[in-house]
């Protein structure tokens, strides 16, 4: 399991421009991520997803996020997420630990 505090810093630096995590948070360029764990791709209510995201059909969890966050466009070809990915596995683990904590409160 990753480090939540390190993950929060990564989120602020690399994700917060497009995403929020708090319950009831607004969608930005990307969807609000609250409740992402256990949710299928393309299912955040009120956000307009590409068909690629809606049709991927996986459920978000630690393993799927680990793979997705390495290279989003490879994992879901056609996604509108323009983020290049996080190559370091330890940084992805930290970010996932933070997301698991922050999106469940």
Swiss-Prot record:
An annotated GO cellular component: mitochondrial intermembrane space
Location(s) in or outside the cell: Mitochondrion intermembrane space
Chain sites annotated for binding heme c: 15, 18-19, 81
Keywords: Acetylation, Electron transport, Heme, Iron, Metal-binding, Mitochondrion, Respiratory chain, Transport
Family: Belongs to the cytochrome c family.
Record function comment: Electron carrier protein. The oxidized form of the cytochrome c heme group can accept an electron from the heme group of the cytochrome c1 subunit of cytochrome reductase. Cytochrome c then transfers this electron to the cytochrome oxidase complex, the final protein carrier in the mitochondrial electron-transport chain.
PTM text: Binds 1 heme c group covalently per subunit.
Gene name of this polypeptide: CYC
PROSITE patterns: CYTC
Keyword Disulfide bond: no
Chain positions found as N-acetylglycine: 2
Annotated organism of origin: Aptenodytes patagonicus
SUPFAM superfamilies listed in its UniProt record: Cytochrome c
Protein name in UniProt: Cytochrome c
First-listed, main subcellular location of the protein, grouped into a coarse class: mitochondrion
Gene Ontology terms for molecular function: electron transfer activity; heme binding; metal ion binding
